[in-house]
UniProtKB/Swiss-Prot annotation:
Family: Belongs to the tachykinin family.
Function description: Tachykinins are active peptides which excite neurons, evoke behavioral responses, are potent vasodilators and secretagogues, and contract (directly or indirectly) many smooth muscles.
Annotated GO CC locations: extracellular region; synapse
Primary localization: secreted
InterPro entries: Tachy_Neuro_lke_CS, Tachykinin_dom
Residue positions, PTM Methionine amide: M11
Pfam families, A to Z: Tachykinin (PF02202)
Organism ancestry: Eukaryota, Metazoa, Chordata, Craniata, Vertebrata
Organism in which the protein naturally occurs: Cavia porcellus
Keywords: Amidation, Neuropeptide, Neurotransmitter, Secreted
GO biological process, alphabetically ordered: chemical synaptic transmission; neuropeptide signaling pathway; tachykinin receptor signaling pathway
Subcellular compartments: Secreted
Gene from which the chain derives: TAC1
Protein name: Substance P
Amino acid sequence: RPKPQQFFGLM
């Protein structure tokens, strides 16, 4: 599963 930083990067 993606890391928190990667999740925010998609936004």
